[in-house]
Amino acid sequence: MKFMHISDLHIGKRVNDFSMLEDQAYIFDQIQSIIMQEKVEGVLIAGDIYDKAVPSAEAVQLFDDFLTELAAKKLPVFLIYGNHDSPERLAFGADLLKHSNVHVSPVYNGKIEPIIVEDAYGELAVYLLPFLKPAYVKHAFPEAEIGSYEEAVSYALSRISVDTNRRNLMVAHQFVTGAAVCDSEELSIGGQDNISASLFADFDYVALGHIHGPQHIEQETVRYCGTPLKYSFSEVNHKKSVTIVELKEKGTVELTTVPLIPKRDMRKIKGTYLEVTSKSFYENSNTEDYLHITLTDEEDVPDAMGKLRSIYPNLMKLEYDNKRTRENQSIDQCGEMEEKSPLDLFQEFYTLQNNQEMTEEQNEFIKNLMEKIWEDM
């Protein structure tokens, strides 16, 4: 059976105060066309449907239109809520949607029942695992000892009976250890929300959401499809796409990606004011793109933002890179260091190196060690 795997639609998102709704509607039309071209037989949507727990009316209408068009194609749709979504709002009307072959993960209550579909190779079980926090699993199983995301997801999966003799597909929205991240994602401090890819060993394909760059983790069949659009300038080098996954006989999974072409790209450009405003500089590019411009002029250009927007109307961000800004940056960094104690600096270094903060015991040990060093000097 051939599926399209998409995730992290973030409908209603604003980037630097620019609404992305028009761009999202454009890319959704493209996705619908790809579904027809690729002869897709089912659609997997791995969470973060909306950008906010309480989406705007326009965002809800756009997703309603998208789902309605999918349902009109008589395709089964499988979707879960992500960390940006409201579980209760997204699950509203789930029983009614089933009649249109749209399967929505309910608010997590400890039960995850497979949805069985059939094709020429037999039965295929689809499991919908919505975004889980330790508190969600603890609420469903008060007796369980759960302190981490790893323990929460592991416990939730242990309550599922998986028949490994048939094909099994999982749709999930978590941060799997090893994923490359970018600025537009919301992750827990210190890597506390990491889970291991090995938790999904029983599944033939794991359709992941949460991470915005397309990538696989440890093996090709544990995959983040990425966002359909760029949502921050840390994503400028991403090649956005949809993932097409075909599960044939047990053990045979074929993966391809189909590129998505946005209405407006997100790009960075750099140069002097005269360079970036020269017609020869921009005449072969889309001036409607969302831009981050860095000017290298030594002197500030009066009303640079307004002037540049006469050429690049969707200029989102403007900054300078010159001798003055580099000196100021160096002074700021030195000033910050001078104001901090050796213990503060060591704590920052430890956090940077280990991606987690020091414990109270470690803090006390370093503090005592520093005091001893000062006494011996």
Residue ranges and their predicted role:
Residues 41-47, 79-81, 167-171:
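Short beta-strand segments at enzyme active-site cores
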Residues 197, 204-262:
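A conserved active-site cap/scaffold subdomain adjacent to cofactor or substrate pockets
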Residues 55, 84-218:
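His/Asp/Glu-rich metal-coordinating catalytic cores
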